Amino acid sequence: MVILFSEEVKLVAENDDAVTSGHVENPEEEQMELSLRPQTLDQYLGQKRVKKEMSIYIKAARQRDEALDHVLLYGPPGLGKTTLAFVIANELGVHLKSTSGPAIEKAGDLVALLSDLDPGDVLFIDEIHRLAKPVEEVLYSAMEDYYIDIVIGEGQTTHAVHVPLPPFTLIGATTLAGQLSAPLRDRFGIVEHMQYYTVDELEKIVQRSSDVFHTSIAPEAAHELARRSRGTPRVANRLLKRVRDFAEVKGEKTISLATTSDALKQLQVDSEGLDQTDRKLLRTMIEGYNGGPVGIRTLAANIGEDMETIESLYEPYLLQNGFILLTPRGRMVTDKAYLQLGLPIPNDN
């Protein structure tokens, strides 16, 4: 494909206000994640199947002295996709360049990134489903045959240049794998689905993070916090920071179960890890639409969230834990949702 060079890539940060959001909220939280980030697969907690498979692929690539095949990581936000990309690069002993789909505004931005890679390096693109179509098309030849075609010069001096690229590994991360085009998806040789973490796995993460934060947490408090963290390490670490604040104000040297429960109540995180937006979504379906079915566009308009946020951030957890069902006609709440909200279950439900 022939494209034009453009200016430098602009990095974009996105914010989310919900304490149980799986998204990174601000630069401070991004720095916190860096401090907690494991360096090796052995240090990486959870995702046992993914770790086992990636360990084999990495060892094989190193033995052949080849670039690792391109990797697609998909699943809800906050499950460690970015962290795993850094771990993979570290295990390979190569450099990693990180960007996101929305940050690559023009095809030339991607060309600049690709041209700066050394043999075997990793290019990590978060939110890869949000790449613009012209940018995505540049990736096809780059991923498959390690080359790009660019146009340089102006007017009569314009000419096309074939630019070979060193063998590299593209790691793409997405919360919405279904939005990837088939041509792009088919070029990933390794596709890994990131699963929600178990309470035991999150408990270990909470204990490890408390050590990094130079604080102490009682085992039963760590368990309760893990239980309400939506199966998501990022949520667990965020809640731990807030609970730590409550404990410090109370003068506790070790975070207790009582303080943890009080703090989570203050933060409006209920016994199942549901937050205000979760409950608003469920109540809207129940009180406005008799429990559903309700279309995603209607839901988004009613609760003031965009459709992508609902689909990537809220629905996966509500589905996984049996609060809603997806039907051909839309979303429906389950009996469990009525019980969690303290509402009577309709006779015909």
Curated annotation (Swiss-Prot):
Name by which UniProt lists this protein: Holliday junction branch migration complex subunit RuvB
Annotated domain remarks: Has 3 domains, the large (RuvB-L) and small ATPase (RuvB-S) domains and the C-terminal head (RuvB-H) domain. The head domain binds DNA, while the ATPase domains jointly bind ATP, ADP or are empty depending on the state of the subunit in the translocation cycle. During a single DNA translocation step the structure of each domain remains the same, but their relative positions change.
Stretch list, region Small ATPAse domain (RuvB-S): 198-268
Source taxonomy: Bacteria, Bacillati, Bacillota, Bacilli, Lactobacillales
GO MF annotations, alphabetized: ATP binding; ATP hydrolysis activity; four-way junction DNA binding; four-way junction helicase activity
Top-level taxon in the UniProt lineage: Bacteria
Subcellular location field: Cytoplasm
Principal subcellular localization: cytoplasm
NCBIfam families, alphabetized: PRK00080.1, ruvB
InterPro entries membership: AAA+_ATPase, AAA_lid_4, DNA_helicase_Holl-junc_RuvB, P-loop_NTPase, RuvB-like_N, RuvB_C, WH-like_DNA-bd_sf, WH_DNA-bd_sf
Keyword ATP-binding: yes
Record-stated family: Belongs to the RuvB family.
Region (Large ATPase domain (RuvB-L)): 13-197
SMART domains registered for this protein in UniProt: AAA
Annotated source species: Lactobacillus acidophilus (strain ATCC 700396 / NCK56 / N2 / NCFM)
Subunit comment: Homohexamer. Forms an RuvA(8)-RuvB(12)-Holliday junction (HJ) complex. HJ DNA is sandwiched between 2 RuvA tetramers; dsDNA enters through RuvA and exits via RuvB. An RuvB hexamer assembles on each DNA strand where it exits the tetramer. Each RuvB hexamer is contacted by two RuvA subunits (via domain III) on 2 adjacent RuvB subunits; this complex drives branch migration. In the full resolvosome a probable DNA-RuvA(4)-RuvB(12)-RuvC(2) complex forms which resolves the HJ.
Cellular component GO terms, alphabetical: cytoplasm; Holliday junction resolvase complex
Entry function: The RuvA-RuvB-RuvC complex processes Holliday junction (HJ) DNA during genetic recombination and DNA repair, while the RuvA-RuvB complex plays an important role in the rescue of blocked DNA replication forks via replication fork reversal (RFR). RuvA specifically binds to HJ cruciform DNA, conferring on it an open structure. The RuvB hexamer acts as an ATP-dependent pump, pulling dsDNA into and through the RuvAB complex. RuvB forms 2 homohexamers on either side of HJ DNA bound by 1 or 2 RuvA tetramers; 4 subunits per hexamer contact DNA at a time.
Positions of DNA binding: 331
CDD domains: AAA
